[in-house]
Amino acid sequence: NIVFGLELKGIPSAERLSQGRQYLRMVGLERFETRYPHELSGGMKQRVAIARALVNHPKALLMDEPFGALDAQTRNIMQSELLRIWEEEKKTVIFVTHSVDEAIYLADTIVIMSARPGRIKDVIPIPIQRPRNRTSSEVNLIRDRILCDLRSEILTC
C-alpha cells in the first residue's frame, strides 16, 4: 500500500520495498508490515498515510484534518510524531485543522480563513520554541488572539 506510488513511477521492486520499509520504520510501524488496513488502529492508519505520502518525496505535504477522527490521547501522540518526522524530513507541511490548540502546537505560521467567502483573514506567526508547552502564557496569548479572530465574524472582541 505504501509503495504503490513508487510502482506507478516504475521504481524496481527491491528499491520500492527498501524505501517502503525505511518509511515504515520512520513512522514506527515496521512490525506491522504485513498487516491489512482493517487490522490497524486509527492512529496506525494515519501513520501509514504519512509514510505513503513521504515515500514519494513530495516538496510539500498537504494534510487536511488528518487527526480529526482520533481520540484526544492518540491525537496528541500523532501531533508529536508529526513534529518528529518533520524534523527528520524538513518538508513543508500545509496542515488544515479546526483545532486552535493543534494549530498552535504544530505551526510556525497560522493562516486564519474567514467564513463564506473563504479568504485569508489573518496570518499569525508562532514565535514559540519547540517543544511547546500547551498551557504556557505565550500559548494562551496566541490562543486568545485566534479565538478573538474567529469570533469577530459574529461579535466584536
Locations of regions flagged by a protein language model:
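Conserved H-loop
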Residues: 91-96
